[in-house]
């Protein structure tokens, strides 16, 4: 279905027909869907806690694996799939929210620096359990980020007709947020360098 972006139109339960039906009875209609709130399914409302994020990318999407390394067995608490344009929004929203937190409460306490020898991707996935129900992840086409004096949250949202809904809710401590923001920014920059390199003026 086509969804023209006319901000002056509202959701219409009886939209005007578009193209007339063809010989097979197939037709298309134009409609407006501008959600102002997102439903939170009961199974999502409690959210999951993360201590870090691992980002994988391809030309078409990003995979955000939120890690839970607090108690054993270590596991991937949530997997979220977004397109590059939404990844840009996530990086901006997370960075802006961390800036607002810092203005209100000061810099979050720093975590110890990780060891110099970084594990490979294969080693990480050997140590962090990924359950079968998370293999395909949860899709998101927008995000909302917020904070309290001690925690941050990410609400990943799908804005599909007829009802926008939260597809994943992630929470983390203020201690972990700077490293998460840095990881997201680094992943976005690496994506740009890999798939949209700057023109070579030489």
Label each residue range with its predicted role.
Residues 1-202:
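Positively charged, low-complexity terminal tracts
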